[in-house]
Amino acid sequence: MPPPAWGWGSNPLEPVVHTVAAFSRRLLIAPDAAPDEARLRPLLSLSLSPPPTPPSPPPPPPEVLKKDSKAAPLTKEEVGRATWMLLHTIAAQFPDEPTRQQRRDARELMAIISRLYPCKECAEHFKEVLKANPVQAGSQAEFSQWLCYVHNVVNRSLGKPIFPCQRVNARWGKLDCPERSCDLEGSNDIIPNR
């Protein structure tokens, strides 16, 4: 293919691109078809221009951008409140007649938290609390009451108010799930069958 009348540009690959483009036109036209450009459907498109820049991601929805929100890690207190909320919710959902595995899981969960909790000082204190107050998970009521007691042990050490454990189910009762879909099912499977 001869160079175009206007000459080759500054791109050293320009002659190659033009040759490949001309060759691909010949390949894409059926032998019995007229070589009209409208019928060409290239499998590969080559261009000398730089690729277009991808569009920027859309801004987050307004509810995500709160005026008072801070872009900082959680405080020790925020992590503590969230952890207790999770633990009390788990205890509230704990079965009335747990399997041996569920009782073991409850003990193991507390042990794992005492090892992996993001506040080292808090984790060490929780280990001491667990040593003095081993996990009691024979039923939902027992586990919830034990957790409330342990939470109060921690609260006392921090000079915080004590929660009345007789109200634990009123505060962190069973989740409102249709057809008891929140109930724990005894299973040794890591990923339950669906």
UniProtKB/Swiss-Prot annotation:
Motif residue range(s): Required for dimerization and substrate specificity: 177-182
UniProt's post-translational modification comment states: Contains three disulfide bonds; one catalytic disulfide (Cys-119 to Cys-122), one structural disulfide (Cys-148 to Cys-165), and one shuttle disulfide (Cys-177 to Cys-182).
One Pfam family, please name it.
Answer: Evr1_Alr
| UniProt-annotated location(s) | Mitochondrion
GO MF, one example: flavin adenine dinucleotide binding
> What cystine linkages occur within this chain?
119-122, 148-165, 177-182
**One cellular component term from this protein's GO annotations in UniProt:** mitochondrion
Q: Which residues bind FAD?
A: 76, 81, 84, 121, 125, 148, 151-152, 155, 160, 171
Q: Where is the signal peptide?
A: none
Enzyme nomenclature, EC number: 1.8.3.2
Q: How does it assemble?
A: Homodimer.
Q: What does this protein do?
A: FAD-dependent sulfhydryl oxidase that catalyzes disulfide bond formation. Oxidizes thioredoxin in vitro. Required for the import and folding of small cysteine-containing proteins in the mitochondrial intermembrane space, and can act independently of the oxidoreductase MIA40. Can oxidize the cytochrome c oxidase assembly protein COX19, a typical substrate of MIA40.
PANTHER family from the UniProt entry = ALR/ERV, FAD-LINKED SULFHYDRYL OXIDASE ALR
Protein's recorded name? FAD-linked sulfhydryl oxidase ERV1
Q: What is the lineage of its organism?
A: Eukaryota, Viridiplantae, Streptophyta, Embryophyta, Tracheophyta
